[in-house]
Amino acid sequence: MLIILVNGTAAWGCRLVSGRFALVPVRDLKTHEAAQPDRVRRVMKQMRSTGVVKKAIVVDSKSKVVLDGVHRLNALKSLGAVRVPAWLIDYSDDAVLVFSKDRKSQISKDSVVRAATLGPKFPPKSTRHMTKAKDGSLVPLSRIEAEISVPLSDLLRSH
């Protein structure tokens, strides 16, 4: 997969989703979905093994709701991280869409923010945040996230 970042914008045959990269304090982030403990443990093991975080989470810049990366966030929290690499985007942008897991029904962005701020959370892996490719097909935001290499040690309390 080829990802091009131009002035903080990711393009992958899609309408552009603008954003910026930042290290965000863990305490500021809110999740709208529950996490699967086994998956969190697998992600933790991989992060410990490599010593780096290879993919930023996707976060709404305004509400600080995690749109993609709940398991990565929970793994980082469990490892003692106080900062998380994040791709901050404007969730109100029409280019960002949210669907149910099966992609058959659209979910409102308001319900995602409500679940994160007031509860209850959605079940694990139940929402899919997408954008449209130039051909009209849906592309998960996770497919247009740039790979990164942030040392785990840079995110921990002791740093």
Sequence positions of predicted segments:
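Basic- and aromatic-enriched surface patches that contact anionic nucleotides/nucleic acids
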Residues: A35, S49, V65-H159
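Short alpha-helix boundary/capping and kink motifs at helix termini
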Residues: L2-K62, N74-K77, A81-I89
